[in-house]
Amino acid sequence: MSNIKRYNIFILLSTLARNIVEVFSSVLLYKMGYSLKEILLFYSLVYLTGAITSTIVIYLTKILKPKYILIVSSIIFSGSFYYMSIMDKTFTNLIIFSIIYGLGAYTYHTIRHYYAIKSINNHERKEIGSILIYTNIAIVLSSVIGTYVETKLSKLILAIIVIIISVLAVIPIFKYEDRTNNNKIKIDKIEKNKLLFFICEQAKVINLSLQPL
């Protein structure tokens, strides 16, 4: 099996698991009794944790292969959702969940793009667009599965499903032929217009997440 096929399977399954969490977190927190202000604080802490994590993770690739970072990320992320499924409604638990969630989410989002671009053979790069197809399929499936399980079953069952899918997602990565050069890492300054676009885009994501409330 080629790298791109392994990576697409990883993207399909990992996006399916993660999107269940990303789509339903605000709804589940609201159902637990958290206010809109507390949910906005949750997102603020997630992005703050993400900003720090994204920078550190790139330098971690000098020490660890990206696939191992992705595997650890999957463990942290699925663990964060399990924690939310069993936690009591307290301010401290919300802070802890926000930090764990941010660590797992931004370790994943940072490395998966870096990993695809740096690791895939030149002759396979023309197929990278297929990643978007698998991502969109997973987004649709996650909405359907998440809605059904959350309404018919429980948060704990939903968390267990996320953990199982996350474990299955990392299996193809074990056999991924890693061609990254860990000694060459370049951090470029983000242009102001791109930074503004990113901020507006994330504000849109938060707004969409809060719409069901």
Regions found by a protein language model. Give the residues of each.
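Helix-loop boundary and gating motifs at the non-cytosolic
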Residues: 1-48, 194-213
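Hydrophobic core of transmembrane alpha-helices in multi-pass small-molecule transporters
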Residues: 12, 91-108, 202
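Small-residue (Gly/Pro/Ala) motifs that create kinks and tight helix-helix packing interfaces
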Residues: 26, 138-150
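Residue-level signature of mid-helix packing/kink "hotspots" within the transmembrane helices
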Residues: 47-55, 139-140
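Helix-to-loop junctions at the C-terminal end of transmembrane segments
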Residues: 53-66, 150
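Structural signature of the two symmetry-related core transmembrane helices
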Residues: 68-83, 163
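Intracellular juxtamembrane helix-capping segments at the cytosolic ends
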Residues: 106-120
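Symmetry-related core transmembrane helices of the 12-TM Major Facilitator Superfamily/SLC fold
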Residues: 157-174
